Amino acid sequence: MPFAQVSDGTRIHYEVTGRRSGAPVVLIQGLGATKSGWNLQRIAMATRYNTIALDNRGAGRSDAPTKPFTLEQMADDVIAVMDEVGIESAHIVGASMGGVITQIVGVKYPERVRSLTLVCTACRNHPWREDLLKSWASTAQDEGMLALGKNAAQWVMSPRSFRRLLPAIGWLGPLSVFRSKSPFVAQVNAILQTDETLTDQLATITAPTLVIVGNQDVLTPRGDSEELADIIPNAELIVISGAAHGLMIEHASTFNREVFGFIDRVESRRSLAVSQ
């Protein structure tokens, strides 16, 4: 079971799958999710890319630090995993909170990035979303993780999927979020600490960037992605019709087609530049 140990001693679990000779792709999940949230992508990537999926600190098999941490530290965790695997640069794909981590990687470590894919994410904390995250943290602390899973599901899935999967949410909740409430609350606090500095730095990103969102996303609505695409130089914006916050699961085939096509285009341009 591979781990990368970072400077503060935290061990970050990761898995490498796919074609070792393929372009490296790093997958970063969001709040309450482990690397298993990328399973539909990892399966489809198996014959194309060298895929590195990690569990964020506090989630899955990674360590859960007892001290507070920041999203910048979580971006450093991504680089530590890349160092451990021996990857000099990669296509970084991040969803939701993982998308914010991906933005930080793009700003802080431009030389390690081949491209950025920002999935259902944002670059600022709107007051209504801060209040929602605080309410989730309170639910986790006061009512437990099962109650949190039921509450959060309606923000992640489209109304149709929510109705279809409602009978299963009782067991989906604890499986899709953290082992205990403390790491979850720590990640919420890390998100809430992120300030406008990141937004101001996005214009310095030089890597090719894809911003992708569902038109039914109510947690990180289309406007958040439009803002990202406006600020980041030459960013591409794709809006998937009928998709909500969990678009990589609910609309996996469409999502995969768009993301893989973007990565392949970037790789083609890289190969052409090297040959000239």
Predicted features and spans:
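Active-site loop/oxyanion-hole signature of alpha/beta-hydrolase fold enzymes
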Residues: I43, I52-G94, R257
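Catalytic active-site module of serine/aspartate enzymes centered on a nucleophile-bearing elbow/loop
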Residues: A235-Q276
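Short beta-strand/loop motif that positions the catalytic acidic residue
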Residues: I205, V211-V213
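Conserved alpha/beta-hydrolase catalytic His-Asp/Glu region
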Residues: P127-R129, L146-Q201
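Flexible "cap/lid" loop of the alpha/beta hydrolase fold
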Residues: Q103, V107-K108, R114-E143
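Acidic catalytic loop of the alpha/beta-hydrolase fold
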Residues: N215-T220
